[in-house]
Design a protein with these regions (language model features):
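A short beta-turn/strand-edge loop motif at beta-sheet boundaries
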Residues: 112-118
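Short, well-ordered junction/capping motifs at the entry into regular secondary structure
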Residues: 266-269, 340-370, 413, 418
Length: 430
């Protein structure tokens, strides 16, 4: 043990930082590279100083910028497809008290409206020598720049597990940060029930009052561009794409000749479709997240008895039994179209860009819980919530093919988890 520590200290002292700026391919929508002039390549001031690369706003919105050094490389993500914008990425490595290395990452997250009620979720992934990418679990991270982030600004992440990955001075390690807008749903009671009639599931138990702990749900459905980033990162590690995704009316992911994928023009912000339950779960595990349960989905639509939760009870829900996220008006009441449902009168023949009906969001501000795409939930089908054996999975929320009343908080449908449909997508929960 002592000898290993001495070797680590000796190796750390000898380590010379080698830097080469590499401009990666643009995010999944393009195959064109970008050449960085030599004068823009960051200089290393000392081995313990941050490495800085000038990143214009235009570049950070459109291109990945990889900084390849002996220990760490950083990806700058774009925010054009419901990833939150992360900029001014800087990194350094320092020894820990035990002599092993720790990696420090600092960055800015610029969305001005990040708050405790509408936080960001930031996750970190790494790859050693271009091998398989891996999620850095939150147990290996410290600082204010990962997991749930409740205010914008300058953030820091300390990765304590660097030494456990057997890095050496000749390795090239890429690090990628991505952020998702989440919505906080406070703990507390809410009205959960199933009523007979229409497409509603009459076999469900009526539960006039239920209680859930605090959870978070993505403000938007997962987009085509987000899912394409995932496909391009996992590469040959797994499946997740099928030929129907090339349909540019209902999806729009195009395979390239180099085993990568691109988003069809103009389709970045549309919800991903033709997704099985397993595909959705794999994407969310890639992020460190999960699918919402049926109960969470219904509470996200209706809101709790108190919108600030049972702990404070200062903001009573004026419509705790509302059938739709916006209230009790039908989706097409009085010629106002509140979600994307069957037909074209709402302005969309197929899916709509996520957030198109944001003024008709849920009491918490979650968009598109009614219509657009029906969404996978975590639950197996059963006659009571949360329980059941392997078989069908539940989808909620209605879709662009649903009649208006089927876009409510009550209606659910059963699907085999292998089903891939143009009317089904998903969103994240935590």
């Amino acid at each position: 043990m002592l000898l290993s520590r001495e070797r680590a200290k000796f190796s750390s002292a000898r380590r010379k930082v080698r830097i080469a700026a590499v401009i990666a391919k643009a995010m999944s929508r393009t195959n064109f590279g970008l050449t960085m002039p030599p004068e823009e390549i960051a200089a290393v001031r000392s081995k313990n100083e941050f490495l800085e690369v000038p990143i214009s706003r235009k570049q950070s919105m459109s291109h990945r910028i990889l900084l390849s050094i002996s220990i760490v490389a950083v990806l700058c993500n774009c925010a054009c497809s419901k990833w939150l914008e992360i900029s001014n990425l800087k990194i350094k490595q320092e020894p820990t008290e035990l002599g092993g290395p720790k990696t420090i990452i600092v960055y800015d997250i610029e969305a001005p409206d990040i708050s405790p009620e509408s936080p960001a979720y930031v996750f970190v992934r790494f790859s050693k020598d271009k091998s398989n990418w891996r999620l850095i679990t939150k147990e290996s991270l410290r600082g204010n720049g990962f997991d749930i982030i409740e205010k914008p600004g300058h953030k820091q992440v300390i990765w304590w597990g660097t030494g456990q990955t057997s890095f050496n001075e000749f390795d090239k390690v890429d690090i990628r940060l991505r952020g998702i807008r989440m919505i906080r749903v406070p703990a507390g009671q809410f009205v959960m029930k199933s009523l007979p009639g229409g497409g509603r599931d009459e076999s469900k138990e009526i539960q006039p009052s239920s209680k859930l702990p605090l959870f978070y749900m993505a403000r938007y459905e997962t987009t085509i561009s987000m899912y394409t980033d995932y496909l391009n990162e996992i590469g040959a590690e797994g499946a997740g794409w099928n030929k129907r995704m090339t349909n540019t009316d209902r999806c729009g992911i195009i395979p390239n000749s180099d085993n990568t994928y691109s988003v069809a023009p103009g389709r970045d912000n549309y919800p991903i479709t033709y997704i099985s339950w397993y595909d959705a779960m794999n994407f969310l595990q890639w992020c460190g997240l999960r699918l919402p349960t049926e109960a969470e989905f219904e509470k996200a639509i209706r809101g709790g008895l108190f919108l600030d939760g049972d702990e404070t009870k200062k903001d009573p829900n004026p419509m705790p039994e509302r059938p739709y996220p916006w209230g009790d008006e039908a989706p097409n009441s009085n010629g106002v179209f509140r979600c994307n449902y069957d037909g074209t009168e709402d302005g969309f023949e197929y899916t709509a860009p996520v957030g198109s009906f944001d003024i008709f969001s849920s009491p918490y501000g979650i968009c598109d819980l009614a219509g657009n795409v029906a969404e996978w939930t975590l639950d197996w089908y059963s006659t009571s919530y949360h329980t059941g054996l392997d078989g069908f999975r539940m989808v909620r929320g209605g879709s662009w093919m649903a009649v208006p009343f089927a876009c409510d908080a009550i209606t659910g449908a059963t699907q085999l988890p292998i089903k891939e449909s143009s009317i089904m997508g998903f969103r994240a929960a935590k």
